[in-house]
Amino acid sequence: MVKIYGNWCGPNWTGGRRLSAQEYDERGLDWNSKAISPLDAGCRLHDFEGRSGKMPRAADTRLINTARSRVLSFRAQVRMEAAALNPFISRKRRRDLNARIDESIAAERVATGISIARAFRTS
């Protein structure tokens, strides 16, 4: 079990639990459980598609594309980090900025991890 991000992103991290997607499905748990961001929702779909124990290559491709779309450019991330340090912004705005930065960092990890895993999958 490695939680990478949110409720759904990470090997054997499914629905906020230390379970494989197959175990999660066999226990009849809710696949509509909350995703905290678009990246987390992409991970949930990926888990759902791999619930049989075999991960379709198309599911990997979809998650890689979703993850890459959530990665901030260097400039955008620096701007968000600077904005989050502004003492005059609201707590909610600071929390939202930090959450988006965290999602971007996790998205890089997810895209890289799935790309590597896909190279070793037999299905």
Identify the meaning behind each predicted range.
Residues 1-123:
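Extended terminal accessory/targeting regions
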